[in-house]
Amino acid sequence: MTLKRSVIGRPKNQVETVKALGLKKIGDSRELADTPAIRGMIKTVQHLVEVEA
């Protein structure tokens, strides 16, 4: 997963979700386990991140 858009001006819950996913700056990437909790977090910020299968 890669952060593609900035969290500046986004609601607090979206900013905290991006942090919880381990993303800090635009372009940061992480490989995460495919769990229901992670999927829920991705759904919350799907407009800010790009997910590669």
Swiss-Prot record:
Database matches in InterPro entries: Ribo_uL30_ferredoxin-like_sf, Ribosomal_uL30_bac-type, Ribosomal_uL30_ferredoxin-like
The keyword Ribosomal protein is annotated on this UniProt entry: yes
SUPFAM superfamilies: Ribosomal protein L30p/L7e (SSF55129)
GO biological process terms on file: translation
Gene Ontology cellular component list: cytosolic large ribosomal subunit
Keywords: Ribonucleoprotein, Ribosomal protein
One of the record's GO molecular function terms: structural constituent of ribosome
Annotated family: Belongs to the universal ribosomal protein uL30 family.
Subunit structure: Part of the 50S ribosomal subunit.
The protein's name in its UniProt record: Large ribosomal subunit protein uL30
Organism of provenance: Deinococcus geothermalis (strain DSM 11300 / CIP 105573 / AG-3a)
